[in-house]
C-alpha cells in the first residue's frame, strides 16, 4: 500500500520507501499528506528526496521535522526563519505555523516580524534574561549600524584607491642636473659593459717571421715517392718525412 507522502506526491511507493519513516511521527494521514506537500513545495520535490536520501533511516523523522519547521518559520518570517523566531523568543509563532500546516491551512508573512529589517520580533526588556541580551544586541547593532557602514565604505574605497594607485604606472623620476644639461662629448657607447675575456698568448709558438719558422720544401723521392719537409731557418735544419695523403 502506498504511503501518504508518496500518494500526495503521486510517485511510486515500495516497501523500501524512504519517505514513509519520515512522516510516521505525524498522527493523522491527512496531516501527513499536508506536511509532505508543504515541504515539497518549499524545498522542491527533488530537493526533499535528496535531503532524505543523504541521512540514515533512523534520522529521517528528525530531518523531516526540521525541514517542516524551517519551511514554516521561513514562510512567516522570510528574513530570519525558524532560527530567528527561536532566537527572538517567538518560537510559539513557529509552532502555531506548523499546526496550521498540519490542519491544511495556508501561511503568509507576518508584518510585525518584517518591520525593522527582520529584527522587530524581539521581546521587551522586562521578559527574561535571554530576551534582554537579544534586545541589547539589537540596540547596539542599530546604534553602530551607520558608523560601521561608514567605516566599511571608507575602508572599501580606501583600499580601492590604494589598489588603483599601486596598479597605476609609477611617476616619471626627475631628471638629474647632469642629464638635463647637454653633454659636449659624444656618447657612442663604444665601451663594452662586460669585460672582454682575453686568451694568453702562447710564446712557444713560432711566428712566420721568426728564425724557428718551418720552411716547407716539397721534393719527391725518386724511389718511394714520399714527401719531406725541412724545419729550421736558413739552410740548415732537420728533414722530416711527411705522409703522402693525397697520392
Curated annotation (Swiss-Prot):
Residues 1-107 form the LOB domain. Signal peptide: none annotated. InterPro entries: LOB. It holds the Pfam family LOB. Expressed in young shoots, roots, stems, leaves and flowers. Residues 157-170 have a biased composition (Low complexity). Residues 157-184 are annotated as: Disordered. Belongs to the LOB domain-containing protein family. PANTHER family: LOB DOMAIN-CONTAINING PROTEIN 38. This is LOB domain-containing protein 38. It comes from Arabidopsis thaliana. The lineage of its organism: Eukaryota, Viridiplantae, Streptophyta, Embryophyta, Tracheophyta.
Amino acid at each position: 500500500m502506498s504511503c501518504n507522502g508518496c500518494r500526495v506526491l503521486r510517485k511510486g511507493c515500495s516497501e523500501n520507501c524512504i519517505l514513509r519513516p519520515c512522516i510516521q511521527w505525524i498522527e493523522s494521514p491527512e496531516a501527513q499528506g499536508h506536511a509532505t506537500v508543504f515541504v515539497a513545495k518549499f524545498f522542491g520535490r527533488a530537493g526533499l528526496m535528496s535531503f532524505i536520501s543523504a541521512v540514515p533511516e533512523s534520522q529521517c523523522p528528525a530531518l523531516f521535522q526540521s525541514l517542516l519547521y524551517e519551511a514554516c518559520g521561513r514562510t512567516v518570517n522570510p528574513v530570519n526563519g525558524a532560527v530567528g523566531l527561536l532566537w527572538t523568543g517567538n518560537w510559539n509563532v513557529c509552532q502555531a505555523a506548523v499546526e496550521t500546516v498540519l490542519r491544511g491551512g495556508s501561511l503568509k508573512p507576518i508584518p510585525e516580524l518584517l518591520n525593522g529589517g527582520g529584527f522587530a520580533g524581539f521581546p521587551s526588556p522586562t521578559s527574561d534574561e535571554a530576551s534582554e541580551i537579544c534586545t541589547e544586541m539589537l540596540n547596539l547593532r542599530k546604534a553602530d549600524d551607520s558608523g560601521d557602514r561608514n567605516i566599511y565604505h571608507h575602508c572599501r574605497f580606501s583600499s580601492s584607491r590604494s589598489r588603483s594607485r599601486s596598479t597605476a604606472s609609477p611617476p616619471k623620476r626627475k631628471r638629474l642636473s647632469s642629464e638635463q644639461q647637454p653633454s659636449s662629448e659624444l656618447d657612442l657607447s663604444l665601451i663594452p659593459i662586460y669585460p672582454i675575456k682575453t686568451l694568453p698568448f702562447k710564446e712557444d709558438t713560432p711566428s712566420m717571421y721568426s728564425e724557428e719558422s718551418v720552411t716547407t720544401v716539397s721534393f719527391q723521392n725518386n724511389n718511394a715517392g714520399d714527401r719531406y719537409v725541412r724545419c729550421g731557418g736558413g739552410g740548415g735544419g732537420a728533414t722530416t718525412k711527411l705522409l703522402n695523403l693525397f697520392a
